[in-house]
Amino acid sequence: MILLNSKKRLATLLIVLIFGIIIFILDLGATGLVDETPPLFAAAARAMSESGDWLTPKVNGIFRFDKPPLIYWLMGFFYSLPKIEIWDSLGTISARLPSSLGSLFLMLMIADTLFCWPQKGDKQFFTPIAGSLGFALSPLIIIWSRTAVSDALLTGTLGISLLLFWRRMASENNDKCIAAWAFLGFAILTKGPVAFVLATLTITFFLIIQKDWRSLLNKINPKKGFLITILISVPWYVLELLREGRPFWDNFFGYHNFQRYTSVVNNHSEPIWFFLYIMILASLPFTPFLYHGIFIAFREFLKSLKESCGVPDSLYTYSLCWLSAVLIFFSISATKLPSYWLPAIPAAAILISNSFISLKNTNKTYVYLWIFNIFILFGVSMAFFFSNYWLSSINDPEMPNLASELISSGIIFKAKLFFSSFTLLAIILFFLKSRNILLYLQILLLVGQSYLMSPIRKLADTSRQLPLRNISKLILDIREGRETLAMIGLSLIHI
């Protein structure tokens, strides 16, 4: 470990912070909440703030037992801040901030870990920024970090916890590992027992392959640490069980945890290899380097079986254990959703950075991987140049004019321009044998995030959510007393 309170470390984290604010915070409240689930989260949190009942999440008096309360508490806290009607007129900043901040803090933790514990071949400035951007620019992270549900917050709290566990095992100081266990408690308060299961699997996989596993286990202080996790996470479950009894037990533990894992819920049935497919999408456009990073980490693990390898040099092996834990656990699950892969993306980002660091630009593997990657980028560019063939297949009853609006708004043209420029730059940097090609392309993707994603979000909001907000405003103007509004397909709603 490099124990530095150096200007270089602070500068690196400041750069990562600025990038994170651009990706996760910028224009966070410019659009309304989309779909059914995020508004329900927001409504439950707002009800907590207004009623003062911070124990049981409810929407219009109806219990919501699907998730633990941390996401509601954080949303409710932001809803309780003064002058919210000025700085959050749509109420979407308050609803989305927990997800955004969870991803932002995890991004900083990834950068700091890669800076303070450089692995073999790492560049102390390049690797932390590239690794953290690899996480933040994942298509799934970009989407869920701006969505008012609990998945990104789980990824943030669990990811920080797992990195802190490894940092403790890699460190020679006498830290009691309190923070790691505390964040694990927060993760359990975000999504439930699944957080504890994933953390246990990751650490168990890692310890099994370590020769001095007993000393490493003692380092993370499991007896006192587990007590900290229990003190943070368990009291709410006990209080909720005492208040609501059997309905809470059956709904939360029975349906939303056990039944979701053992049987298909809401028609979300997918084949066992589903997350191998999601892994490809989640790591675009650098997916080939993820698989190479996995190969390199596995090779280093096999090498460590023959030669002694210190824990400070084992971050990539630990990341492989982390990714494997998520992959195995959710592949066995009967119910499968793309969001289940989010907790593995921090590990995937670290493995992608491992791939770039381990390759030299004269290496044949490097050449083959980049040629494959350029073909992927070229394919994406061509998809937009021939968009007329697939735009007509878009059939969304809630946005019937979406295809024509994508063209008339200029978004399709911008996508053609951006991805063709991106592909061309990748080819130029490849032939110039640039050492920092990954970082340059990531920065261009960062620009593209604002150039493309922001207009797309605003177009979707204008087409889908703005009409609903206009109707809601009209209803508030003509409503008499506490009349109830009935909407087809939804429960009774008080506006």
Question: Which residues does each predicted region cover?
Answer:
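Membrane-integral, polyisoprenol-dependent glycosyltransferases
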Residues: 1-366, 386-387, 461
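Membrane-embedded architecture of ER/inner-membrane glycosylation machinery
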Residues: 2-4, 9, 178, 296-492
